[in-house]
Amino acid sequence: MNDGNKIKLELYPKVAPNTVNNFISLVKKGFYNNTIFHRVIPDVNPGPPMIQGGDPQGTGMGDPGYFIKGEFTINGFTNNLNHTRGVISMARAAQPYDSAGSQFFIMVNDCSYLDGQYATFGKVIEGMEVVDKIAKTERGAQDRPLQEQKMKKVTVDTFGIEYPEPEKISQ
């Protein structure tokens, strides 16, 4: 984060392989560097308690120029990782299901009604207090933080494993 705090994730390629390939590919390209968490919903607010980022425009409308297949149950893909505290999942449009690209959200608390509807693919293993702090920041219209919550640099350690480019769907 811009303030020096860190959020460390563990990714689960066996749960959502193409989603993980996509995330790693974007990280390696520096796509997420200097992007913001443009939407934050604390647990006390209606809606899923989460922080959302990964949009190069910072508006909630940006993407990498392509989509990926949604790896979740209602889209015909078995993904049993539930939306519990700390889980990371891909954001997408309501329709079509295959509309995820780069935006993701991290759960602040459990939200079972999202299970099977979004592609979960990892979990926060360090820095959940940073997620909580971001979620509690003062918000304006469309749950946008009044003070910018910027990801200064996003890195990935694949521990020597090569991950292929994701399978992409044209827009």
Model-found features: residue ranges?
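Cyclophilin-like peptidyl-prolyl cis-trans isomerases
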Residues: 1-171
